[in-house]
Amino acid sequence: MAKPSYVKFEVPAELAEKALEAVELARDTGRIRKGTNETTKAVERGQAKLVIIAEDVDPEEIVAHLPPLCEEKEIPYIYVPSKKELGAAAGIEVPAASVAIIEPGKGRELVEEIAMKVRELMK
C-alpha cells in the first residue's frame, strides 16, 4: 500500500515505537494535546515540542496541513503507523490522528532524541 501524500519521510519501526513511548511518558508525567484540532492549536502557538501523526488517517486532508505547519514553526514531527495505537498511547479509547507533546515530563530526553533523529531523516 502506498504511503499517503502527507507522509514526507520513512520512519523506522523502532523510532515509531519510541515516539509512542514518549507520548505515554508525556501523558503520565507531562502534558499532551490529543486530536488534530488541539495539535494544530499547539503548533500554531509554538507550544508543541514534538508532533506525532498517524499514517493511516482517512481522509488525508484531516492531517495534511500538519507537516508544512510544523516545518514553518520549526517543530519536529514524526509518523506512527496506526491512529489506533496513537490513541491508546495518548490514553484515550478512540483512535487519534495526531498528538502534540507540550510538556514531555520524564520523557524529555526521549523527545529530544526523537527530535534529533527526525531532523536527520528530513534532510
UniProtKB/Swiss-Prot annotation:
Q: List the disulfide bonds.
A: none
User: Which GO cellular component terms are attached?
Assistant: cytoplasm; ribonucleoprotein complex; ribosome
Query: What InterPro entries does the annotation carry?
Result: eL8/uL1-like, Ribosomal_eL30-like_sf, Ribosomal_eL8-like_CS, Ribosomal_eL8/eL30/eS12/Gad45, Ribosomal_eL8/Nhp2, Ribosomal_eL8_arc
Q: What keywords tag this UniProt record? A: Cytoplasm, Ribonucleoprotein, Ribosomal protein, RNA-binding, rRNA-binding, tRNA processing
Output one GO BP term: tRNA 5'-leader removal
Q: Reply yes or no: does the keyword tRNA processing apply.
A: yes
Molecular function in Gene Ontology: ribonuclease P activity; rRNA binding; structural constituent of ribosome
A Pfam family the protein falls into: Ribosomal_L7Ae
**Which locations, inside or outside the cell, does it occupy?**
Cytoplasm
Question: Function of this protein?
Answer: Multifunctional RNA-binding protein that recognizes the K-turn motif in ribosomal RNA, the RNA component of RNase P, box H/ACA, box C/D and box C'/D' sRNAs.
PANTHER family cross-referenced by the UniProt entry = RIBOSOMAL PROTEIN L7AE FAMILY MEMBER
In terms of NCBIfam families, this protein maps to:
eL8_ribo (TIGR03677)
Q: Which family does it belong to?
A: Belongs to the eukaryotic ribosomal protein eL8 family.
| Subunit annotation | Part of the 50S ribosomal subunit. Probably part of the RNase P complex.
Listed HAMAP family: Ribosomal_eL8
What is this protein's record name?
Large ribosomal subunit protein eL8
**What organism does the record attribute this protein to?**
Thermococcus onnurineus (strain NA1)
